[in-house]
């Protein structure tokens, strides 16, 4: 057998899956319950979640977390789900209940957004048996007290300053598991990994953008057939 040969099984119907950038494989990965995660797709689009080669999905959205949304994503996904349960608006007992619900439905981790109070993080940590991931939006985020409250992994989403922010926290926390947004291209992803990110979140093209590309392909096919 050829060394490093990795057989790939693919059907004709699934060949258009959303593939994450190959450069993400350079990341060390984070092992959760024996499974290694390098690529984490950032979407709540069930169609994309069902058609991607990412290792996991981070399901957070700009609305209050709701059990129906969490349940729908987990049921549809064929990869592990990290579910959003708390943020600036949703906290306290509701977040703790959301954490319990997410775990009961099969989430592999729960995510708390940047503004989440430490008391809420502690409340979630006390009732779940899965990792708590805290989103970090800048190097000015006070993460020490959040780590003490039960956060196991940080998810850095600092826009254009992400690489600098990853480097900042990696220097101060050499062993801390870090997920980070990779940016728009392979170069920024690689820079993020080099700065110390263990895993990368990837934002896929929208459903509309993917459909537009496919429709263009169909139009070209029709044109070619008409001009033979």
Where are these regions (language model features)?
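Catalytic beta/alpha-barrel core
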Residues: 34-41, 56-63, 84-91, 107-116, ...
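Conserved N-terminal beta1-alpha1 strand-loop-helix module at the mouth
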Residues: 1-81, 87-92, 104
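Glycine-enriched alpha-helix->loop->beta-strand junction motifs that scaffold or abut catalytic
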Residues: 53-54, 77-80, 106-108, 128-132, ...
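Catalytic cores of alpha/beta
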Residues: 93-102, 141-150, 184-202
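N-terminal active-site wall of soluble small-molecule enzyme domains
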Residues: 65-104, 115-127, 139-145, 162-166
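C-terminal helical cap(s) of enzyme catalytic domains, especially alpha/beta-barrels
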Residues: 5, 122-127, 169, 190-195, ...
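Glycine-rich phosphate-binding active-site loops on the catalytic face of alpha/beta enzymes
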Residues: 85, 105-117, 152-165, 195-217
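Short beta-strand/loop segments at the ligand-binding rim of alpha/beta enzyme cores
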Residues: 29, 76-87, 125-135, 170-181
């Amino acid at each position: 057998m050829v060394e490093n040969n990795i057989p790939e099984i693919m059907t004709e119907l699934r060949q258009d899956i959303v593939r994450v950038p190959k450069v993400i494989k350079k990341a060390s990965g984070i092992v959760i319950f024996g499974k290694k995660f390098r690529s984490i797709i950032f979407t709540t689009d069930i169609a994309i979640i069902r058609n991607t080669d990412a290792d996991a999905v981070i399901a957070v959205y700009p609305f209050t977390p709701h059990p129906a949304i969490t349940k729908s994503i987990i049921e549809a996904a064929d990869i592990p789900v990290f579910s959003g349960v708390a943020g600036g608006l949703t906290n306290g007992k509701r977040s703790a209940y959301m954490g319990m619900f997410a775990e009961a439905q099969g989430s592999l981790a729960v995510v708390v957004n940047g503004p989440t109070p430490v008391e809420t993080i502690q409340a979630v940590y006390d009732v779940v048996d899965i990792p708590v991931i805290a989103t970090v939006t800048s190097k000015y985020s006070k993460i020490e007290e959040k780590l003490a409250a039960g956060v196991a992994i940080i998810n850095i989403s600092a826009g254009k300053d992400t690489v600098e922010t990853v480097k900042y926290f990696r220097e101060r926390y050499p062993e801390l598991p870090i997920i980070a947004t990779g940016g728009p291209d392979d170069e920024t992803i690689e820079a993020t990994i080099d700065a110390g990110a263990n895993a990368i979140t990837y934002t896929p093209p929208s459903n509309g953008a993917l459909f537009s590309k496919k429709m263009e392909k169909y139009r070209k096919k029709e044109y070619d057939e008409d001009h033979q």
